[in-house]
Amino acid sequence: MDSLRDPEHALVVLSGGQDSTTCLYWALSRFAQVSAISFDYGQRHRVELDAARTIAAMAGVGHTIIPINTFSALGGNALTDQQMSPDTGPDAETLLPNTFVPGRNLVFLTFAAAWAWPRGIRHIVTGVAQTDYSGYPDCRENTLRALELAINLGMESRMRLHMPLMFLSKADTVTLARTVGAMPALAFSHTCYAGAVPPCGQCAACVLRAKGFAEAGIPDPLLNRLAGV
């Protein structure tokens, strides 16, 4: 297996959630060296960063957390504004859910590229997906390929953005997680918009996660761990 791995170094944007955890293990199966980067952007629940720390340690990869307080200062979305409740329906004008953080993926990936550049890392892995996305325009392949071009022009580099989940359903993502050995780490991942442990099971993120595991016919290792199974 090692002989089939790319000899280069990959950087994974790790949120502590299901998708980025799956991508971390996908990268471990394909690259000789893997590091993870997370962002403290004033997100609603610190449990996400705690999950990222735990998962990076389980995977045995170097993990860097970059502080960015800009998003909480901007406000206007339920993931950084404590006064807003997630899942109140799409905005009447933009038709986007209030959990959309404008520019988040663009900023994260640009910062990831800036961190990777002086370290000679050319591969950046992100867990965004177009098929199951919640209407987020920064999860679309054309958006991220345009960003890849901008990064390479702006940094005089040849970086590549890897999006292994882009066209996978949530069920396909669960199956991939099992294939790459991510299931033990998924037992410590966090998805719930409410920040609840155990997860609330009712928010859009919880419903989508449950649907994926159910359609894949695989028990959710997080629920099994919390139930003591």
From Swiss-Prot:
Cofactor, free-text remark: Binds 1 zinc ion per subunit.
UniProt EC number: 6.3.4.20
Residues the record lists as binding Zn(2+): C192, C200, C203, C206
Co-factor(s): Zn(2+)
Known pathway: Purine metabolism; 7-cyano-7-deazaguanine biosynthesis
Catalytic activity: 7-carboxy-7-deazaguanine + NH4(+) + ATP = 7-cyano-7-deazaguanine + ADP + phosphate + H2O + H(+)
NCBIfam families: 7-cyano-7-deazaguanine synthase QueC
Family: Belongs to the QueC family.
This protein's name: 7-cyano-7-deazaguanine synthase
The species this protein was found in: Laribacter hongkongensis (strain HLHK9)
Gene: queC
